[in-house]
Amino acid sequence: MKLKYLSTILPAQDGEAKISNISCSPNGSRAAIACSDRSVALLDENGVQKDRFTCKPIDAKYGKKSFTVLCMTFSPDSSRIAIGQSDNVLFIYKVGTSWNEKKVIVNKFVQPSAVTCLSWPFDDKILVGQLDGKVRIGLIKTNKCSSLYKTDETVVSIQTHPKRTSFVSAHQDGSIILYNFSSRTQSKICTLQVPPYNLVFTNHGLVVATSDRRVLSYTENGVVQQQFDYNDQSEKEFSSISCDPTAQNVVVASYDRLRLFSWSARRGAWDEGAPLEIQNAYTIGALGWKMDGSTIYAGTVCGGVFSVDCCLRRGMLKSRFETTYVAPSHVILRDVTNDTRTNVISNKGLAIDELKIMGKDRYVIGYTSSSIIIADTESQRFSELEWQSGGHEKFYFDFNNCCLIINAGEVTVVEYGVDGSLGWVRTELTSPHLLSVQVSGPDVEEHKKVKKLAYLVDPTTISIINLINGQQESFINHTGAVDWIELNERASKLLYRDKRSKVTLVDISSDQRSVLLSFCTYVQWVPMSDVIVAQSGDNLSIWYNPDLPEQVTNMKIKGEVEAVLRDADRTEVIVQEPTAKVAYELDNTQIEFGAALEKRDFDRAVAFLESNTSGTDAYSMWIRVAEMALEHGNLFVAQRCYAAINDVAKVRKLHDILEIADEASISIGGDGTHFYKVRAMLAIMGRKFKEAERIFLEQNDTESAIGMYTSLHKWDEALELAKVLNYPEYEQLKTSYLRALSDTGQDSKAAELKVSDGDTLSAIQLYIKSNKPLSALSAANNDSVLSQDENILRQIADSLVKSQLYDKAGDVYEKLKDFDKAVEYFKKGDAYGKAIQLARFAFPEKVVTLEQEWGLHLEYIGQYDAAVNHFVEANDLKKAVEAAIRAKEWPKALSIVENIQDQKVRTGYYGEIADHYSNKGDFERAERLFVEAGLFNDAIMMYGKNNKWIDAFRLSEEFHGREATISSYLAKAEDLDEHGRFAEAEQLYITIGMPHKAIQMYDRVGRDDDVLRLVERYHGEHMHETRKRFATQYEERGDLKAAEEQFLKAGDFRSAVNMYKDSEMWSDAYRIAKTEGGENMEKQVLFMWAKSIGGDAAVKLLNKHGMLMEGIDFACETGAFDLAFDLARIGAKDRMGTVHVRLATQLEEEGRLEDASKHYVEGNKPELAVEMFIRDNDWADAERVAKDHCESLLPDVYTGQARRAIEEGDHLRAETFLLRANKPDIILRYFIENEMWPDALRIAQNYLPHQAALIQEEYEKSELRNGARGVDSFVAQAKEWEQQGDWRKAVSALLKINRDSTDNDALIKHSTEKAADLVMKFLMGDEEYIGAALGALDEANCNEKAAELLLLFGQSRQAINALCRAKQWAKAKQVAQEYLPEMVPEIEKIYKESLKSEGRLGELIDVDVITAIDMMIENDQWDKALDTAKSQNYRPLLDKYVAQYAAILVHRNDLSRVLAVLERYGASANPANFSIYKLLMEETLAKPRFDYTEIARVRNVHLDVYNALQKESSEHFEEFSRALWALHLIAMRTALEEIGDSVPEVQKLCLKQSLSLLRYTDILVADRIFYEAGAAAKDYGSEYESLGFLLLNHYLDLVDAIEEGNGELVDYSPFENSDIPTEVSLPTRQWLESAKHEEMKEWVLASSVDDAHAKELVYDKRGVFEASLKDKRGTAEPCLVTGYPVIESTVRIGSMVAEKDNLNKFLVVIKSNQTENLLNVQNFVAKWAGSPLAISL
């Protein structure tokens, strides 16, 4: 906090005029200054003096100057000021809350001594410190004072704790006493050395500023915390002290100075702030801190008052609210538009970290580290509650006096002005429309306050809780989801609307619900009333009295209701009509009537009713006022109300009551309404008889209580009360009661009284007389004597018959042993159960007839379900069935029908029952019944009517043939198609196997989603193509979003991007590129987007995505330099040079060198222009640019020109340019390297004289090393001698040029070959020169020239060897073929070795493919080697290497790779490979679960071998044929098992395949094959269960043999009439896991004790096992589908056969359950058989 001088309030005087006290009001609107002239100046909130009044002496006789003002303080409500004076009096002045109120003394407390200090902690209590040492308390209401405690030392200061829990008093002797309000005890906590005149009580203890220039801090227990000592500084004694409203800051005043101390929560101690120096202020004797904490008023000894601004910092919110932090925990918010101020204070002392303005700028939210503060700027109330904010809370300010905080499913209610939450609930439904809260304002009386919350527990349940006690008041369940709720102002009623727009009103106290409207678009309570306004269509409905929801007022409107507005004069509904807003005025008088009742203003309500007598609901309103008046004891108003509605009885009654009250008022005083008879009679009027009884009995007025009941004819209550009270005239009362009953004909009631008195016989007679025979019978049965009296019983029986109570009469006759009459009356009374029960022992022959009659009776009365059993008992099954059908007991009806012997009758009923099951949806049972009844067409029509076309097709095919069915159903499908019933048409098309027609249908009508669905299901390979086609169509139609979706689903995002690019919808193109195309595509589209818009927009776009630099680069790369310049100019001027250089580079590539040079220069890269011209040998331009822009490059230009001159051999020009470039060293080095010694010496002497001697020395060494002229001389000599024709000397000179004379290999080779040419031309007869030439040629490695010389010399072999050394293989071979043919193989061998050593495989393949392949294999390049072998089109060669590679892979255990190799290059029929094929098969079939893909691959390999062996007619053909059949059956079964057993045909096909596999157990895993076959047979059903038992039993034998390692333990005798092998190799371990093995073992053991399971195979008509191919006639061909023998219904498929039914089933399964594996099986079979599969008719 900082202190800053603000302004002068009161100017200082020339002499002493001490300001004795300054006090600020708690509401912050006023400040009072006690001046030296005994007047009090009043300041407003801005520090401007608004008023002044003069203080009074204790008595006017003492004069105005007889006292001084010693102390002063404001009351807690800021409306009064207490002033303590030296003349032993304390005055309290009422100053009011406005400036125009008169200042009057309202309290005067005369004290025994002067009042030295004051504190006013409570409205009705004030603390007074006196000169005599007493601390007293003044009671404002009684105007009396009493002493709290007394000391002997003057009280110099009193300070109250900020929380008003205690206070301290400081005394002249330095002692400080702490007084606790709750315990009413005081204790001395410390004693100072000097009087503690300047004392404040803060939240953190006491702060005392003493006259010895020290500031001390104490705890509440009197322990010193801190001490600030200013004795060593230029400080004078402290004269006053003040604490801010938050008790976090303290200001201490002295001479010309204010010192500030602030509490540090982090340190837990006081920190001293910067002091404020005020020149010429002198001693500051009074301080007052304004309650908003922003300003301190300081009064001086000279009468001056100035203000000091104290704040931490200032700020602005929303450019409207000025924030002033006067403390970390205190912020003043000022609205600059109207200058209103709001305090936001943390009462916990926590720093306010953040402020937010919400709720239409009315509410302020302050956040601290652990709490939240909510302030209402209009009511100036704020609340603080504990809160840990995550930043996700929401605030609802739509409710009066409170707000709601929504956070993480919790709703917290906060009442303004009350710290802490009012309550909270948990709910996920937190919309403001689903919450309603009513909290009464502070002006409402405490007992009338309402605090309730209504919320939704779930979408259909409303809960209402009382926030005062936290109890749930109501729990409302609704049938539908609720979308709006609201409580009325008194929270007595709730309105809610559900999502079906039905509005319901709930009375919370009675839980009574009333539906107001079934459809409502707007509903609302009228503000400040219980009137409801709702809109339904063009009707506006108003309920002025919600207690009578049926009374509604309607008016027509022409728009939608927007709001309901109310002021003092009128209430209007604002309706938005088509052209304008219209206000519809409501009946404000009726609204006022409700308000009057709410305020209990009965006179006003009666006046309203009297002036509105014509209302339709006047009667109910009079009743309402009357009842409320009675409830509140206003009898005259109640009488007036009843008179208005002509209720004469109540008017008279009230008249009587009023007379009694008037009489009572004379004796008991008051208005007499408290007299007990008045209260009792009012209770009787309200039908509260028990309360009236209580009132009478409380006064011992028994007669009146009993008389009340008898006058009301409540004799039972009168007798009961008389009996309880032992009323002496009880018997007489009872007699009077009986007489009254007899007079009024209430014999039955008299009989009850007789029964209670024990006179049963009289009671029976009375019951019979009153025609209540049942009561008479009950009374007789309860009397042991009368229950045996035959006469009495017959009288009762006759009375029962007369009353037509026949069943009861039958009971009586049965009791009298008169069974005929008993049965007769039982029948008459329809008590057939009792009749039959009686007839079973009395008349057994009548039982069946009675059952039949009972059934007919039940049928007559409609109890058909009960009649069924009785018809059955009567053996009338037809009637039983009909009754069961009429009772809709269909299972019972069906069971009865099945017991009817007549087939014709039974069939008729089947049809009717089937119709029921059809309608019910139990189609399977209905089908069975229809078929049973022979109603095949009805069954088919049933399925058709219910769109179950598959079942309809199945039945139609079964009963009408397949061809006719397909034809009719195709026509039906087309008809459905034509009539727009596409879903049914689709189902039919698919059922008959024509999904393409369904696709065409949907495509024709534009139902693209259905097209895609069917294509995906039946033609998945065309899915992407179809999506692209649709996308193109959508694009053409302009539906780009749909086109985008299809492009993306087709995986063609580029087309989607291009589509949006073509449409210039760049944002969409960019979105797709970003999400689908990756970073490069994203950038590319973004840059093209920028290119399309250009300018500032392009720069903004690229900057938005952080791609400006990349955009410039992209523009340059794509040649869009105009865009690049724009982007660089607008957004990146530093890149302009780069763009110029990039453009120059492109221009250079295009040959536009002049333009390029300009851009190089503009790009600040002239050196690149120079280099460009140098590369182009444009020396003039290079020199020009270098001179103009970069002279440092001129030497490079000249050097380049020199280099060009050297290349052209122009040494003089080169020398000139190098000298211009100032580089003589380069030309010197050039002359030396080229042994141009004279020129070198010249340059050195002229330009590099320091090197001249060195060059001269080198020149001499060179001459010495090369003889006269060195090698050049030999060349010159040879040329000269050659010209002269001296060939020998020429050759000799040339041969001298060798490695001894020079290192120039080219010169040596040239000279040697020249010498050889001369020898061949002129010296062939001279062997010496020939030899010398050959030696030189060999030394110079000129083998080809040597071969030429040797060939001329006749040395053919040596010539050929020379050509081989020269790698001239063709020439060598040509020479060999001509001169030495025997050397040709040797040459070829050498050639191959050369190719091999050099790795030249391409050439080696052409020469020796075997060697080349072997080289590849050595390098582990098997794929390349096999491809090379395959390219030779020689199968044995390929088979050889395939077998070799396969063997290696097998050794590596890489069987998957073996399969891949065999699939790629084919499997050969070489027996050497058979072990590999066998291993592949064993390993694949050894896995726990068969994998179709792996089995299919092994099967395909075996097919290749099979075909090869078949062509060769190999002896191994049969072996591979069996293996292939086994693999084929396993693969087909595996593919079918993927579908599951849901398709019946699949299970049968899999079973047959499993049984067929038994014949291959000698090459398969025997225990597995037997187990799978046995399990399949067992699961199929009873037909094959015995076979399953046999096979599984054999499987167990095999497992036992495996465990024992002895194959002889297995018994094969059950398989004699089959082709199942009897000798199989046992595996090393069992295949099945132990758990399943044990399960199957238990089943076999359990089945072995069942005689139904015989150990035998299933035989066919051949007399052999049905899966066996062999029989007595020979061997049958196996079926391609099942492996079963094909005996009849043969279908020929290429070279193989299939059984017709099985083939058709298999193909139907493929069509209806198409899978990739089934299609693969179909293709394999077609390939194997050599013909495609097709359904056979």
Curated annotation (Swiss-Prot):
TPR repeats lie at residues 700-737, 803-836, 848-881, 907-940, 979-1012, 1037-1070, 1137-1170. One of its GO terms (cellular component) is intraciliary transport particle B. SMART domains: WD40. WD repeats lie at residues 14-53, 63-103, 110-150, 151-189, 191-229, 233-273, 511-553. Belongs to the IFT172 family. Component of the IFT complex B composed of at least che-2, che-13, dyf-1, dyf-3, dyf-6, dyf-11, dyf-13, ift-20, ift-74, ift-81, ifta-2, osm-1, osm-5 and osm-6. This is Intraflagellar transport protein osm-1. It comes from Caenorhabditis elegans.
